[in-house]
């Protein structure tokens, strides 16, 4: 009986939160040939997914608002997890529900993560490691706050970036069906997921360029080149988040120096990640600030 109830809870949770999952590629994802699929999913007591790791087969999960509420805006959610896992429960499921309540479509991107056990070649490099406080943001060149400062782009990062580009293609292909305005699609990334979205901007052509980019304590993991048609940028982080705050201050300056639109929220209430449940801290208001920023900019 307990087993039946557990299965029923899982099915109910899936029906309520995951409307549709679409694989990004037909067959093996480019760059993952020969890599063993070892995906692992963790669930909470209510059956909802909390974390996903070992992702080799990337996909998007579509969360749509009620049609009567739809604003036409869509947010591609890039979860954090250090490129080793996805914090799917907090960064995708919870965030998607919050966005849907406001008429915004949410697309959870399950990009490829680092596969453990030596199944992928390690990146080369000099072993140089980044260490910067927020006042040392000038240490960071081209807004690249990758922990490895060898100058070589990480294969795992580039695979995830390519998945983000493919996700943008899919959302635009289905825009009419999902009641989405193709000109109102952007990325929202947390931690490493912010780096994935920012990397997609660097690699984007006109077809893939988002209308906006929001990064929550997630600096760039590759050299930033701000395009002429740069999307509007929203940044939120804690000022004492080592390396991260410095990387995001550097990103803000790079964006503004290029003449692009950027807004930054630098909170003085802690040293690491934060969420909407931090009600006693100023950083707990970031979602409301993000939503106001979206509406102010016509999204």
Which residues fall in each region the model found?
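Short amphipathic alpha-helix adjacent to the substrate-entry channel of hydrolases
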Residues: 89-108, 253
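Alpha/beta-hydrolase active-site loop
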Residues: 122-176, 288-289
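C-terminal catalytic histidine-bearing segment of alpha/beta-hydrolase fold enzymes
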Residues: 258-299
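The feature captures the conserved acid-bearing segment of alpha/beta-hydrolase catalytic domains
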Residues: 206-267
């Amino acid at each position: 009986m307990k087993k039946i109830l557990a299965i029923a809870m899982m099915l109910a949770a899936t029906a309520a939160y995951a409307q549709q999952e679409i694989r990004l590629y037909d067959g093996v994802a480019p760059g993952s040939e020969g890599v063993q699929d070892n995906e692992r999913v963790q669930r909470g007591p209510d059956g909802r997914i909390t974390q996903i790791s070992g992702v080799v087969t990337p996909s998007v999960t579509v969360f749509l608002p009620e049609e009567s509420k739809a604003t036409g805006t869509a947010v591609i959610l890039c979860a954090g997890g250090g490129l080793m896992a996805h914090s799917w429960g907090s960064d995708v499921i919870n965030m998607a529900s919050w966005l849907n309540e406001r008429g915004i479509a949410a697309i959870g991107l399950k990009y490829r993560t680092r596969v453990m056990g030596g199944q992928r070649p390690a990146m080369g490099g000099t072993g140089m490691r980044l260490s910067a406080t927020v006042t040392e943001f000038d240490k960071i060149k081209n807004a690249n706050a990758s922990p490895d400062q060898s100058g070589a782009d990480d294969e795992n990062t580039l695979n995830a970036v390519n998945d983000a580009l493919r996700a943008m293609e899919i959302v635009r292909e289905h825009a009419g069906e999902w009641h989405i305005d193709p000109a109102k699609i952007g990325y929202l990334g947390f931690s490493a997921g912010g780096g994935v979205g920012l990397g997609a901007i660097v690699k984007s052509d006109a077809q893939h360029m988002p209308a906006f980019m929001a990064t929550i304590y997630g600096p760039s993991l590759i050299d930033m080149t701000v395009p002429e048609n740069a999307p509007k940028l929203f940044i939120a982080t804690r000022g004492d988040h080592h390396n991260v705050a410095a990387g995001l201050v550097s990103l803000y300056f790079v964006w503004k120096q290029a003449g692009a639109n950027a807004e930054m929220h630098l909170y003085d209430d802690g040293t690491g990640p934060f969420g909407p449940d931090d009600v006693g801290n100023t950083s707990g208001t970031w979602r409301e600030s993000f939503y106001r920023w979206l509406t102010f900019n016509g999204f």
